[in-house]
Amino acid sequence: MTLSTPPSSTRPSRRKFLQQSAVGTATVYGLSLERSAHAAGSAAIKIGMLGCGGRCSGAANYALSLGKDVKLAGMMDVFQDRMLEKRDFFRKEFPDQFIASDETCTSGLEGYKAVIEASDAVLIACASKYHVFYAEEAVKAGKHVFIEKPHAIDPAGCHRLRRLCELAKKKNVC
């Protein structure tokens, strides 16, 4: 039996495949987050953004579009102008779901604490070197975590994340 490759015109491009895979992953993530939050007895799912660039904003936009029970509780970015721009965007586009206060809309490197505290789930899409640190802080606080790729930038970070996954399982936030 000979397997042939379909002509390139019928094969999806690598870009198209990755886009469709990302949408599928986000959908599964959204469903599992919704189920776990509702199973815990909470009516609303509060999300927080660590990073206000295109990827984190896109993930937050998608999560908020899942339904009125998803609320944006906080956002942080190193650059204040970027955070303010996204804050204004989400306030306008999702007025009933934007519940972030001035204390949970922060800039700089220390603002992550207020965002994690205010959230049930944290979207991490910022400079890759901070992914592991922010994920550790969120899981230790008992929060669900979504991290953009790359999850870690070196082998030590990968090992820390692997151990963090075990902690997340114990805390039932995986």
For each of these PLM feature ranges, what is it?
Residues 132-174:
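Beta-strand-loop-alpha-helix segment that lines the small-molecule cofactor/substrate pocket
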Residues 94-124:
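A structured beta-alpha segment of the ubiquitous adenosine-cofactor-binding alpha/beta core
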Residues 114-133, 146, 153:
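Rossmann-like NAD(P)-binding element
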Residues 4-25:
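N-terminal secretory signal peptides and thylakoid transit peptides that target proteins
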Residues 58, 81-85, 114, 130-134, ...:
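Extracytoplasmic/secreted proteins, especially bacterial periplasmic and envelope-associated proteins
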Residues 43-45, 68-71, 119-122, 141-144, ...:
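Loop/turn elements at helix/coil->beta-strand transitions in domains of secreted/extracellular proteins
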Residues 24-95:
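N-terminal Rossmann-like dinucleotide-binding module
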